[in-house]
Amino acid sequence: MDDRIINFEPLIEGVLIKRYKRFLSDIKLDNGEIVTAHCANTGPMKGLLNEGAKVRISYSSSPKRKLSWTWEQVEVTGINNEKVWVGINTLFANKLIKTVIEKNLLKDKLGDIATIQSEVVYGQDKKSRIDFLLTPKISNPDNRKIFIEVKNTTWKKNKIALFPDTETKRGQKHLIELKGVMPESKSVLVPCITRKDVDFFGPGDEADPIYGDLFRDSIDAGMLLIPCCFEFHKDHITWKGFKPLKLDG
């Protein structure tokens, strides 16, 4: 079975000089040229901002863009000095998970899906947008609509992928609203784990204990958790399957 899930043009390699002003990163390419790349991940990126780390960036010739380069991946040193590439472009997570849905990799967990809608307005104040709203096929035994929230997950401790890596009021609100659509609809949280060197997923209690409490409340109320793991390469991404939940360490 071919576990490649997405192919793309080979990325350009270089080393990280620095990330600054949240959105910007200076990269020294292998040919010696220094470029400024957009950094879509504005969080602390724990363990991923080591100066001199190998990185991969993409190029766009679109005249509408302020920056032609985008920082996509960074190499980190894992257990036993294993080199691991981590996907850091948070805007890519939804594309990955949509591909997983379209390839029916979630069929055993969600059943047959008829339609996929993106960025649908929902919530008590109608000011939030759910990443994906799925409508099941008539043949699906559970005919409830499925609300899916995707969380790009890069932080790792002790073989556990953790989200969030900082306090997130927005993430807290998402959990409250996911809980609110139940039981009339099904709510699903999908951590998009963009590194292969993990065995479990857990809430980032150390970074945001309130999120951790809300996460547990939502799970107890029936929210489905589907942590999806991926391995990043220079010109493709491979599917590494699901990771089980691990709480408290």
From Swiss-Prot:
Species of origin: Prochlorococcus marinus (strain MIT 9515)
Family (UniProt): Belongs to the SfsA family.
Designated name of the protein: Sugar fermentation stimulation protein homolog
A molecular-function term among this protein's GO annotations: DNA binding
Highest classification ranks of the organism: Bacteria, Bacillati, Cyanobacteriota, Cyanophyceae, Synechococcales
One Pfam family matching this protein: SfsA_N
